[in-house]
């Protein structure tokens, strides 16, 4: 368990919870996989404006890695 997990909890559980909240808001099922991909897309969108930091790219890659881990949830 990494330092972020101590603060935010398990990444798969966290993205499943994000998916549940987005599902309720959108009235459409959003899976943990969907949530992780959409978080990566948010980071991609940020690269279009201003001067994105290296962290933006690292975060986008990390969200896609999480999406890979969540694909069966």
Task: State what each model feature region is.
Residues 1-73:
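Intrinsically disordered, low-complexity regulatory regions
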């Amino acid at each position: 368990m990494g330092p972020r997990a101590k603060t935010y909890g398990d990444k798969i559980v966290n993205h499943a919870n994000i998916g549940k909240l987005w599902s309720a808001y959108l009235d459409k099922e959003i899976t943990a996989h969907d949530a992780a991909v959409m978080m990566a897309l948010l980071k991609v969108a940020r690269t279009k404006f201003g001067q994105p930091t290296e962290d933006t790219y690292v975060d986008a890659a990390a969200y896609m890695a999480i999406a890979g881990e969540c694909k069966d949830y």
